[in-house]
Structures are given as C-alpha cells and as structure tokens.
A protein has these predicted regions:
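N-terminal targeting signals for export/organelle localization
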Residues: 1-76
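Thiol-/selenol-based redox modules, centered on thioredoxin-like
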Residues: 34-35, 52, 185-245
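A generic structural motif
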Residues: 78, 89-92, 217-218
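Short, acidic, Ser/Thr-enriched surface-loop or helix-capping motifs
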Residues: 79-81, 204-205
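Generic structural signal for well-ordered beta-strand positions
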Residues: 85-87, 211-212
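Short active-site neighborhood of thiol/selenol oxidoreductases, capturing the structured segment around
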Residues: 86-116, 128-133
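Structural micro-motif
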Residues: 95-96, 177-180, 195-202
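Structural microenvironment flanking redox-active thiols in thiol-disulfide oxidoreductases
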Residues: 110-175
Length: 245
C-alpha cells in the first residue's frame, strides 16, 4: 500500500515539475521570439498555461512534418471574399502555387508583407499565389503583445469561421493584399497539416509535390528566400526582368 502511494506521489511530483519547467522554458522562448528585426516586442502579462498549446504548435512548426519532394496535403478552403471554395489540387494544374500562411496579429508578417507583395508582382504570371489566413499568432486573450497595442492590431481569438473571415478581411484591407485569400477552418486543420503556425511559406509544384518550404515564423518568414526559390524554380523568360529584386 505504501509503495503504491509513493508511486502516485512521485507521479504527481513529476507532473508538477514537468509543467513548471515547461512554463519557464515557454517564457524564455517567448522572450527570444520577441526579438524581431532588432526590436524587442515586449509581452503584455498573461496566464502562462494558456500559452502552452501555442508553444506546442511553434515547436511542431520548427520540427516540421513535411519535406521538399513530398506530396503536399490537399485541402479545400473557403475564399475570404465569398466567391466559393478553392481546392489546391485544382489550382496547381496550370501553375505552381505559392502558399502564404499568416494572421494579422503576427508582427513579423506585417513587417515582411511589403516584400511579399513585390514577389507577387514579379511572379504572378508564372505562379498562383494564395494567402491562407490561419489561427491568430498573438490574440489579446491568449498571447498579447505591446507592439500590437502600439500598432492598434488588438483582436481576440475568432470563435467561428465568420469571425475569422471578418478579421481576415480587415487584414487584407490594412495590408493591401491583392492576391486571393483563403480562410482556414476554426479546427485549424490546414495549418496543422502544414505546420504553418505562426507564419510560413510553401511552394507546391504542378506535380503536387512541395518545391519549397520556408523556416517557420517568426524568424523564417522572409520574402528573400521565397524570391530566391521562385527564381530557381521559375526562370525568367528571355528578355524579361521579372524575378529580379
């Protein structure tokens, strides 16, 4: 009896130690992830354990489940503008597809979007671009940032597809996103399939295989590697200057 009780107590102690250590590591990583472009994006205090699912997704994204050369998971999502649903396996038939995964509350996305627009302008004739709006990176009820308060980008987690679509529309207008935007369902199935949270780029070839996969955000969301990948995958036609920085 004592042996069984001792085993239970050790198990409880182990769980307490695990969650305590995870919380400490989480705050260290959050401090690191807030160092973007040489600026400190200070955290607004919030409940630590509410962030554990977010940290889990970030760790999964760093590891990644997909590799270049593998078949890209097919999906069908609603277009933000209400024009219908879009299936990846259909749109890639004519051109390679560039997938931009992000959300409005992600500061690195907002910082890098002008460069992404320039890549789109240079390659729109040779690749199909789709923005996939995913779960918020820094919703005020989960992982708020002072930089979002300063930029007046303060939003709670959308509770259904309609709310997420509304926030996606706000994002599209504010960030001047000209290419089609799709909205991930609130089960976040596409973002999970692509380990895309908080931000990530993919290029899917006409053969349905992954031709390029960026590092995950916040550090991997950069337009320059995407441009380089497209320059290698889609050489400019003779006499064209498209694709140059």
């Amino acid at each position: 009896m004592r042996r069984a009780l001792r085993a239970v107590l050790w198990s409880v102690a182990g769980l307490v130690l695990l969650y305590g250590t995870t919380a400490v590591v989480l705050f260290v990583l959050m401090g690191r992830s807030n160092l973007v472009a040489g600026k400190t994006l200070a955290l607004v205090p919030g409940p630590a354990f509410a962030l554990l699912p977010m940290e889990t997704m970030w760790c999964q994204a760093r590891k990644g489940d997909l590799a270049v050369g593998q078949a890209a998971p097919d999906f069908e999502l609603a277009a933000r503008d209400g024009s219908g649903r879009v299936r990846l396996s259909s749109v890639r038939q004519e051109k390679p597809v560039v997938l931009v995964f992000a959300s409005y509350t992600c500061p690195p996305f907002r910082r890098e979007m002008p460069g992404v627009r320039k890549v789109y302008e240079d390659y729109r004739d040779r690749a199909a671009f789709y923005f996939v709006y995913i779960e918020e990176a820094h919703a005020r009820d989960v992982w708020p940032l002072e930089s979002n308060v300063r930029d007046k980008v303060v939003y709670s987690t959308p509770q259904d597809l309609a709310e997420r679509t509304g926030l996606a529309t706000t994002c599209a207008k504010a960030m001047q996103i000209d290419f089609p935007m799709l909205v991930d369902d609130v089960d976040n199935s596409v973002a999970r399939a692509y380990t895309a949270w908080p931000t990530r780029f993919y290029v899917v070839g006409r053969d349905g295989r992954i031709a390029f996969k960026s590092r995950p955000g916040p550090f991997g969301f950069e337009a320059a590697p995407l441009r380089q990948a497209l320059a290698e995958l889609l050489p400019s036609p003779a006499g064209s200057s498209a694709g140059t920085p």
